[in-house]
């Protein structure tokens, strides 16, 4: 239940933020919570995944968003929504 609420909160936050310039730290905070709640473990090959399978989609979403935001940062560590939207839609 806690995971579902967290995922819903993330989706609302991202939806609200995609229409404007975002601060990277806000999304990082949300995704750090996501990663913590997933109870990450590594498989034999060193790949990370969530021990709780219900959390795996949230973890993938956060991982993809953080990767996308790294590619879209400007000199002030701000991320532009258009770049995030474009890269998320192609991944």
Swiss-Prot record:
One of its GO terms (molecular function) is toxin activity. Contains 4 disulfide bonds. Expressed by the venom duct. The keyword Lyase does not apply. One of its GO terms (cellular component) is extracellular region. Residues 1-21 form the signal peptide. Keywords: Disulfide bond, Secreted, Signal, Toxin. Residues 22-24 form a propeptide. Its main location: secreted. Belongs to the teretoxin C (TC) superfamily. The cysteine framework is XXII (C-C-C-C-C-C-C-C). This is Teretoxin Tan22.13. The lineage of its organism: Eukaryota, Metazoa, Spiralia, Lophotrochozoa, Mollusca.
């Amino acid at each position: 239940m806690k995971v579902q609420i967290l995922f819903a909160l993330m989706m609302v936050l991202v939806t609200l933020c995609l229409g404007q310039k975002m601060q990277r730290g806000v999304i990082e905070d949300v995704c750090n919570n996501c990663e913590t709640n997933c109870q990450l473990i590594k498989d034999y090959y060193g790949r990370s995944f969530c021990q709780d399978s219900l959390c795996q989609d949230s973890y993938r979403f956060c991982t993809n968003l953080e990767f996308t935001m790294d590619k879209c940062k400007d000199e002030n560590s701000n991320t532009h929504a258009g770049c995030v939207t474009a890269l998320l839609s192609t991944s």
